[in-house]
């Protein structure tokens, strides 16, 4: 008799994706973050669902409903802070996951990589709209500033912004539609993640060496299931420490003040995970130029396969490229820091230099370094 997990139509799919999947024998802990992202998504959908049961998407009651969740709902504060800090964990895992892809040349799986970039955009859009929902000062002004950037688009800009707002300013209509989109997008993300996985399983996983591992595969279960569980426990530990000891560490104090269209906060800034892009946006003194740089800073990932000039796929045996990669990481940390600082000297010039360096490393220095490494190896 055939095993039910190999014969049943549904179980067969799960079996081929998570149990009998042939996986490289040498993938390191950097490969854990895909499963961690899946766990983050499930956590966000579940906590979000319970929050939506008590939240009201109306400008007059939104702020009060969030306060009500924290004060009156059983363990509402835990659910709320799990959701808020869960988003931060989501982005930490996302950035590491993308960084792993860049370091080990995983972008050579074109379909998987492109779906991944689309996923990144979708998650960023979802997080932005979620930040607007508590209707605090930073929610309101963040929404106003970021949506207003679309007005930089020639000819249709102003109409587009008013269409998104549903009026002449961020108001009740904006909040309601943002809530609707924030609710539906995670399910679209889940569908895209399934497609992401589908394309990955067409080629099989990459590994740290960047060399085909077809001759040396091991079953996903039990080896990588247990490894993923360990990673998940570590992530949950960090998340629970954040939630239970300093839930507001990554938030903005301004968001504890109800939204007031007549009072602008001194420093409008998004959540920490958008600060690098915000710094790039601010470093260009022209509105349209800034918006284009902002979009380009993420969209540049799509160009990675075309910018790959090395004869080796992975950076594992390429010390010069490794140095550049870590300079890029340091540059992104610098941009994140600058994005949270006021627009004044010396932060302006640091931000501009860091922004130039970001594009310079990816578009110029990395491809040239790869060619130099090829020549050093006489390839």
Swiss-Prot record:
Amino acids binding a ubiquinone: 201
GO biological process, one term: mitochondrial electron transport, ubiquinol to cytochrome c
A GO cellular component entry from the record: mitochondrial inner membrane
TM spans (from-to): 33-53, 77-98, 113-133, 178-198, 226-246, 288-308, 320-340, 347-367
Location(s) in or outside the cell: Mitochondrion inner membrane
Keyword annotations: Electron transport, Heme, Iron, Membrane, Metal-binding, Mitochondrion, Mitochondrion inner membrane, Respiratory chain, Transmembrane, Transmembrane helix, Transport, Ubiquinone
Residues involved in heme b b566 binding: 97, 196
Chief subcellular location: mitochondrion
Cofactor note: Binds 2 heme b groups non-covalently.
Cofactor(s) needed for function: heme b
Keyword field contains Iron: yes
Binding site for heme b b562: 83, 182
Lineage: superkingdom: Eukaryota
Membrane topology summary: Multi-pass membrane protein
Molecular function terms, GO-annotated: metal ion binding; ubiquinol-cytochrome-c reductase activity
Entry similarity comment: Belongs to the cytochrome b family.
Functional note: Component of the ubiquinol-cytochrome c reductase complex (complex III or cytochrome b-c1 complex) that is part of the mitochondrial respiratory chain. The b-c1 complex mediates electron transfer from ubiquinol to cytochrome c. Contributes to the generation of a proton gradient across the mitochondrial membrane that is then used for ATP synthesis.
Subunit structure: The cytochrome bc1 complex contains 11 subunits: 3 respiratory subunits (MT-CYB, CYC1 and UQCRFS1), 2 core proteins (UQCRC1 and UQCRC2) and 6 low-molecular weight proteins (UQCRH/QCR6, UQCRB/QCR7, UQCRQ/QCR8, UQCR10/QCR9, UQCR11/QCR10 and a cleavage product of UQCRFS1). This cytochrome bc1 complex then forms a dimer.
More info: Heme 1 (or BL or b562) is low-potential and absorbs at about 562 nm, and heme 2 (or BH or b566) is high-potential and absorbs at about 566 nm.
Name of the protein this chain belongs to: Cytochrome b
Organism: Phacochoerus africanus (Warthog)
